A protein has these predicted regions:
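N-terminal beta-strand motif that seeds the catalytic metal site of vicinal oxygen chelate
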Residues: 1-22, 49, 68-70, 120-136
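Conserved acetyl-CoA-binding loop of GNAT-fold acetyltransferases
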Residues: 27-34, 89-90
Length: 136
């Protein structure tokens, strides 16, 4: 008998200022916090979560302020990005149409980078979405 394949449990984002990070992910990005403690916080409901953890060891400190490799699915990316702009979120890449949908790249207060993605059929590729589409 073959063992079942593994499933995703969690991904970790390391930070130096845990309260500030939790505030950003909970209040600014509006991700639900499912558990919180001195170990960090767990965000999102479902079979997998994002863990935000204090970088207390030298190896973890090297991981603060880097691309996380995390992509968050957003159903209305242009509206969501407009909200994030109003909340002062730093964008590395504005929403841009790609062959696979619309993508944007943001950074948390410590420089950890996340991608935002909406599965929208492209009308073009690689061009910034215009201000007329709702981004200010």
């Amino acid at each position: 008998m073959t063992a079942p394949p593994p499933s995703l449990h969690s991904v970790a984002i390391f930070v130096t200022d845990l309260p500030r990070a939790v505030e950003f992910y909970r209040d600014t990005l509006r991700l639900p916090v499912t558990h919180e403690g001195s170990f960090g916080a767990e965000l999102l409901e479902g079979p997998a979560h994002i863990g935000v953890h204090p970088a207390v060891h030298a190896d973890a400190k090297k991981l603060v302020g880097r691309h996380t490799g995390i992509t968050l699915f957003v159903t209305d990316l242009l509206h969501y990005c407009g909200d994030l702009h109003a909340r002062g979120v730093r964008f590395l890449t504005e929403p841009t149409q790609q062959p696979w949908g619309i993508m944007a790249m943001i950074a948390d207060p410590e420089g950890n980078i996340l991608a935002l993605w909406e599965d929208r059929t492209p009308e073009g590729t690689g061009e910034p979405v215009s201000q007329a589409d709702g981004i200010s």
